[in-house]
């Protein structure tokens, strides 16, 4: 299995366009040893030929240009994107579909709840129906049964419901449902190796731990170091837990969870611009290094 990190930041990217927190100011000025990042998205392939996008970020055009494998140039108009999987309907995970309109029709796998959001509160399916067939919905069932995307038959994909909330625009924002947010367990049928992917993980319940223990590699939510980080940095008033993100530090945090899984490769993704782990010289980054926890970066490649 080939995995390419197209974007590794949370919504807004890093630096965020309107933010002057310590991290954003420092990376712009060149006084912080850190790497700019686009908004979270990955691509998967079973053979390096055809690829599946997992989420389509607002930065998708720049991400595609940075990864030549997605433009094989076999004909006048071409792409190696053979399918799209949406893990939720958050703005920073689906707005890139608008940029991909010239390549319609696209096969888009998502849950019924995500499809409802994207035909009502943010009706991308309706809007793009005017472009050469638009988005063709392929339903993701939450029955723990694996499914396959035809262009990548070597990958077995299982969707796992995560405890989370629908986006602010959603008609059922205050009434969460299974399928608002999912994680993926992806297994390569030939190598037998597997990835657990959950960029929006608010709570690690016991049933999730069983999937995480099975995986060879974890690519999980690294949004915030502290639950009150937005408040501490004076850029927002919400806690990470209120936004559906488990922070890294403290009792029950992501570090504690990952420490209990010593035999797997552990990588954080969806890093918020305020998170001190973006600073390569920070004590928080040193702590991750000491614990064998990696931080995803744009352009990172993983092979399983």
From Swiss-Prot:
Keywords: PQQ biosynthesis, Transport. SUPFAM superfamilies: Metallo-hydrolase/oxidoreductase (SSF56281). The keyword Transport applies. InterPro entries: Metallo-B-lactamas, PQQ_synth_PqqB, RibonucZ/Hydroxyglut_hydro. CDD domains: PQQB-like_MBL-fold. It holds the Pfam family Lactamase_B_2. Pathway: Cofactor biosynthesis; pyrroloquinoline quinone biosynthesis. GO terms for biological process: pyrroloquinoline quinone biosynthetic process. Belongs to the PqqB family. PANTHER family: COENZYME PQQ SYNTHESIS PROTEIN B, HYDROLASE C777.06C-RELATED-RELATED. May be involved in the transport of PQQ or its precursor to the periplasm. This is Coenzyme PQQ synthesis protein B. The lineage of its organism: Bacteria, Pseudomonadati, Pseudomonadota, Gammaproteobacteria, Pseudomonadales.
């Amino acid at each position: 299995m080939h995995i390419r990190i197209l974007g590794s930041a949370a919504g807004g990217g890093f630096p965020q366009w309107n933010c002057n927190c310590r991290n954003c100011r420092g990376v712009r000025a060149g006084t912080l040893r850190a790497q700019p990042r686009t908004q979270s998205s990955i691509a998967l392939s079973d053979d390096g030929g055809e690829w599946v996008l997992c989420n389509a970020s607002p930065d998708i055009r720049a991400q595609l240009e940075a990864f030549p494998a997605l433009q094989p140039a076999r004909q006048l108009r071409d792409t190696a994107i053979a399918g799209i999987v949406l893990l939720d309907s958050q703005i920073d995970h689906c707005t890139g579909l608008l940029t991909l309109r010239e390549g319609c029709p696209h096969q888009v796998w998502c849950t019924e709840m995500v499809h409802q959001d994207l035909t009502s509160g943010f009706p991308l399916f309706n809007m793009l129906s005017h472009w050469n067939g638009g988005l063709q919905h392929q339903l993701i069932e939450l029955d723990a049964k694996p499914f396959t995307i035809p262009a990548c038959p070597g990958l077995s994909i299982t969707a796992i419901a995560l405890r989370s909330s629908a986006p602010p625009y959603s008609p059922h924002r205050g009434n969460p449902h299974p399928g608002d947010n999912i994680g993926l367990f992806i297994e390569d049928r030939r190598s037998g190796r597997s990835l657990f992917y959950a960029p929006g993980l608010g709570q690690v319940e016991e049933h999730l731990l069983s999937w995480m223990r099975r995986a060879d590699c974890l690519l999980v939510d690294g949004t915030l170091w502290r639950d009150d980080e937005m408040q501490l940095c004076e850029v927002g008033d919400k806690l990470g837990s209120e936004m559906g993100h488990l922070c890294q530090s403290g009792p029950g945090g992501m570090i504690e969870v990952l420490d209990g899984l010593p035999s797997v490769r552990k990588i954080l993704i969806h890093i918020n611009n305020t998170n001190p782990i973006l600073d390569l010289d920070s004590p928080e980054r040193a702590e991750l290094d000491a614990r064998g926890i990696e931080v995803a970066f744009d352009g990172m490649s993983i092979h399983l």
